[in-house]
């Protein structure tokens, strides 16, 4: 019995190391594999170290993606109550702010989360204006654990806007959902009545297809919390993401 107990300890340690490696690889791959970050942010080693700290409760995987200093952005124009047909009952677009000619902020009334308007920013495809009859695929970029209600961390702290500027896809950036994992919560819900999965899978696609020329083909990735959510959403909705 003594020999068995001693010999099992290294195996347990190796199992823990393998489990941690798998855990750390997910946020690292999802956050860095897309090549969206500017030159200055942390390396993969830094992210893995922070993932290790997060595993033991000492920090957040998204600590390296600072959320302070949100830029002040003044829309170049605003469209109130745009007419979009074919939306689910209780869903409407209340306002569209044109931050630039290629970046818009949609403020959506959700039937699933009706308490407050939900903001979704869209980076429009390269040929959006020059080819107004074309429809475009989507790439969804989900935020980290400390997601702000004002703007996605992807546009605050990475070069995602510049990276996709020459690509013919609409980039979809849900705003908000701090600590939600973009899921439907039962309780407790932080006073937010989180129904993010319902919103993103049952309501948002109709807005994008009927109002913003989506062709129904989409992919999803995310940072930290958003990486977990991307995997869960794709697994639970296999016909929605490719």
Please identify what each model-predicted range represents.
Residues 2-8, 17-242:
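Non-catalytic cap/lid and distal C-terminal segments of serine-dependent acyl enzymes
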């Amino acid at each position: 019995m003594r020999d068995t107990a001693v010999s099992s300890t290294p195996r347990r340690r190796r199992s823990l190391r393998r489990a941690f490696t798998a855990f750390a690889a997910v946020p690292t791959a999802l956050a860095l594999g897309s090549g969206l970050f500017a030159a200055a942010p942390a390396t993969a080693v830094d992210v893995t170290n922070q993932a290790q700290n997060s595993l033991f409760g000492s920090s957040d995987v998204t600590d390296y993606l600072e959320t302070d200093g949100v830029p002040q952005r003044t829309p170049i124009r605003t469209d109130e109550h745009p007419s979009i047909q074919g939306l689910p009952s209780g869903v409407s677009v209340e306002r569209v702010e044109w931050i630039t000619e290629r970046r818009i902020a949609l403020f959506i009334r959700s039937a699933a989360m009706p308490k407050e308007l939900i903001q979704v920013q869209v980076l429009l495809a390269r040929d959006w204006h020059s080819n107004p009859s074309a429809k475009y695929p989507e790439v969804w970029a989900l935020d980290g654990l400390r997601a702000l209600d004002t703007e996605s961390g992807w546009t605050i702290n990475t070069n995602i806007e510049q990276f996709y500027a020459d690509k013919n896809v609409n980039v979809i950036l849900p705003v908000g959902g701090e600590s939600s994992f973009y899921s439907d919560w039962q309780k407790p819900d932080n006073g937010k009545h989180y129904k993010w999965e319902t919103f993103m899978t049952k309501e948002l696609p109709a807005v994008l297809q009927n109002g913003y020329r989506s062709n129904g083909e989409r992919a999803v990735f995310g940072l930290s919390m958003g990486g977990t959510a991307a995997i869960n959403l794709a697994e639970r909705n296999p016909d929605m993401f490719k």
